[in-house]
């Protein structure tokens, strides 16, 4: 799909069917995350694929926002591998993970897979529930799947400024 069309047509799906994301599409989505740029090419991102009933139940304990998605990606980063910016006040972890997550989300749209970016959860609680190492910090969850047939797709009117001239 043409990039501006992907960006314009992507929306946050909040009612998923039980249809599974095909393995080849999931691989394509994950590859986009792997190829995402990171500061100094540190590649500190960690992407956890949750698909089993057990892992999705753990997710459901910490957020009401899975919306029935059959696949969820948890995007985290290794705090020990981040690039620290001059002055030592900030590091690349959160922004690199956000770049990776954005690549995943747009690759999903390009593959015809619906998604929803989730931040409504306690990252420490989720890390504990999933048994993640202490050096990893969770940024977000990306719900993946296909919209339920009867779901109402709400596409908001753009609130962005007029196009740049």
Model-based region annotation:
Residues 3-20, 25, 141-156:
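C-terminal helix-cap and adjacent tail motif
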Residues 25-31, 35-100:
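Glycine/small-residue-rich phosphate/adenosyl-binding loop
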Residues 100-109:
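Acidic, metal-associated active-site segment
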Residues 112:
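Structured binding elements
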Residues 115-119:
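Short beta-strand segments at enzyme active-site cores
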Residues 126-139:
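Short, electropositive alpha-helical surface patch
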Residues 153-165:
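Single conserved hydrophobic/aromatic residue that forms the stacking wall/gate
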